[in-house]
């Protein structure tokens, strides 16, 4: 087994990885920016190295500084978490060339799935339904307009190298197209260093469904699906498993096709294949070659530690799991707790946390890195922790989540806890009568 793992991340996911390593007796190295010196992940790790200033480009995205930290601490593996360099093919390639284990996908597969056009082509070749749209990148406006007329408005313009809702524009009518096309290209260049965009048919009322997989050279297994349809501006707020809208027949087809594609491309590690689902049909969206923020809901229903499985696959090249081992039980829900004021258009709320009481109890889990006196800075993602509740069924999971949200106290900053209370008690959520555009259309706060 690995002797020492460097965690190239911060916050709750760094703490989550350190906990998994500790259970296996693996030494850990935390890296941190100057403002994260007193953070929980730094306190919990066996060693820590400051890798730069608070700007992500100078620290958590600084590959030379990370490589120096790896050399300095003699780490034999790196876990990237999610975000930052977790899907950076160049970083994975540098580690491969230096014979340092990357606890994630190979640079080849990161690059393959990071190019959304290539990923769509591969998915289609391997039997997954894809969304109607351009065959590749689109540069000519006249050709783009013709394509839009063919598939019909509304359409979605997306950055080829993108994700997270950036470089993505919905065009409802032809008169808007030129302006939004230019804006999408500019955003794609700004966020991803590549202005290539592609066009797809826009679905008005879809659900967001994703399949968790674990793949070794010996076997590929799926850990069933997650429903991530409660979103605001393409950012997930609540995730759950199983999805309340899928039946067993659709699940079987979805899982078989997903496993087939992942097997065919020779993928290894943890991964998530995302789909949109509407009117009884699913369509490939993208594949994330890393652990997802929402992985705990899958862990709660399957009893499988996804982080440990990632580490084991990276070490041995194989997964110890068989599909018959995966027997989900009950229902799990996750709420992302962000340092934002939902009543003020989700304005960020940095500050120092005062009193902090985190809920506990039967089948209740908090993944976080906050404590009394912790400073929430404006430099990184606003999520401060995740609350996950498990029940025998969806009704019990909702009841447990409501109880846990009532118990959760974070003073000194404004959080999205009040928003989650409203969402969990809303009849649309209770009846599972919603889609990804629910919060963009309805006024909840």
Q: Residue ranges of each PLM-predicted region?
A:
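Acidic/histidine-enriched active-site and ligand-binding environments that engage anionic O-linkages
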Residues: 147-156
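ATP-dependent carboxylate activation and anion-phosphoryl transfer catalytic cores
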Residues: 7-26, 48, 71-73, 104, ...
């Amino acid at each position: 087994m690995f002797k020492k793992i460097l965690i190239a991340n911060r916050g709750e996911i760094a703490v989550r990885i350190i906990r998994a390593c500790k259970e296996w007796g693996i030494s850990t190295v935390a890296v941190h920016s100057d403002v994260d010196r007193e953070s929980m992940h730094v306190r919990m790790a066996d060693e820590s190295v400051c890798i730069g200033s608070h700007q992500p480009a100078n620290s958590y995205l600084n590959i030379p500084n990370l490589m120096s930290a790896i050399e300095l601490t003699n780490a034999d593996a790196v876990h990237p978490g999610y975000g930052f360099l977790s899907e950076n093919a160049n970083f994975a390639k540098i580690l491969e060339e230096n014979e340092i284990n990357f606890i994630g996908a190979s640079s080849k597969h990161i690059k393959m799935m990071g190019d959304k056009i290539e990923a769509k082509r591969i998915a289609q070749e391997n039997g997954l339904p894809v969304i109607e749209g351009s065959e590749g990148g689109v540069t000519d406006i006249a050709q783009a307009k013709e394509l839009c007329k063919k598939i019909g408005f509304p359409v979605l313009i997306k950055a080829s190298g993108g994700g997270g809702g950036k470089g993505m524009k919905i065009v409802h009518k032809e008169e808007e197209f030129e302006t939004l096309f230019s804006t999408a290209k500019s955003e794609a260049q700004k966020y991803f260093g590549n202005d290539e965009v592609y066009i797809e048919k826009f679905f008005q009322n879809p659900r967001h469904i994703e399949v968790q997989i674990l793949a070794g050279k010996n076997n590929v297994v799926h850990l069933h699906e997650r429903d991530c349809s409660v979103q605001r501006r393409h950012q997930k707020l609540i995730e759950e498993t199983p999805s309340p809208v899928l039946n067993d027949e659709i699940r079987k087809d979805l899982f078989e096709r997903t496993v087939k594609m992942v097997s065919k491309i020779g993928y290894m590690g943890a991964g998530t294949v995302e789909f949109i689902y509407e009117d009884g049909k699913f369509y490939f969206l993208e594949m994330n070659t890393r652990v997802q923020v929402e992985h705990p809901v899958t862990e709660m229903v399957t009893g499988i530690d996804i982080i440990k499985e990632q580490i084991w696959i990276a070490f041995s090249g194989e997964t110890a799991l068989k599909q018959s081992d995966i027997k989900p039980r009950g229902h799990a829900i996750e709420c992302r707790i962000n340092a934002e004021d939902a009543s003020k258009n989700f304005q960020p709320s940095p500050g120092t946390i005062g009193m902090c009481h985190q809920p506990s109890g039967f089948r209740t889990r908090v993944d976080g890195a906050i404590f009394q006196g912790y400073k929430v800075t404006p430099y990184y993602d606003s999520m401060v922790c995740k609350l996950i509740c498990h029940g025998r069924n969806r009704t019990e999971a909702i009841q447990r989540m409501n109880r846990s949200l009532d118990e959760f106290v974070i003073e000194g900053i404004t959080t999205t806890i009040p928003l989650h209370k409203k969402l969990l008690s809303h009849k649309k959520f209770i009846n599972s009568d919603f889609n990804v555009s629910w919060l963009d259309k309805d006024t909840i706060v």
